[in-house]
Amino acid sequence: YGEYLQGKVHGEKNIIFVNVSWGLGIGIIVDGRIYTGKSGFAGEFGHVVSYDNEVLCHCGKKGCLETEASGSALIRKLMEREANGEISLLSSRIREKNALTLKDVIAATEKDDVMCIDLIEDIGNNLGKHISGLINILNPELVIIGGALSLTGDYILQPIKTAVRKYSLNLVNRDTTIVISKLGDNAGLIGSCLISRSRMFEE
């Protein structure tokens, strides 16, 4: 909603906002209105069971999309690959048992850390496959990639676009534009404030 009012939206009425931070979720706008579903929980994209990977999601289920395409998945995979002998600018921090944050990984990416870039591109590819399904179903004009990992820019955006071209129907995706959020990691916070303000004035 924040992106809809103050970000990348320029008249589009059918939009999917993908928030890729520690977790993974989406916001859906249909005909200019937020779609919340019956109970208000629409958009739990990260908990679509997509993988037979036996990785336990924080929701208590196994194989959720979030276990392969989120900030938490990125940190887990980075630590797994370092444990298998691969080298990263963050290797010393991992060996010293210092907790890693997404800011650390983004900073390493900006310094051309090959492992971090590779992992982010892999997450982009996984996301793109599943965003393809959303595009086929909802036929949005605009898909906005936001959240912490959107700060990696083209490293995550280009694999998403490539996967969408590969896995979605051309008749549908030709009307869809995919962009990085203007508001970045602040879109959710700004959107919450704007929704609260809107509801206050409605009352």
Language model region names:
Residues Y1-E3:
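Active-site neighborhood for divalent-cation/phosphate handling
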Residues L5-G11, D52-L56, K61-E203:
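ATP-binding/phosphotransfer module of carbohydrate and carboxylate kinases, centering on a glycine-rich
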Residues V9-A69:
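Glycine-rich phosphate-binding loop of actin/hexokinase-like ATP-binding domains
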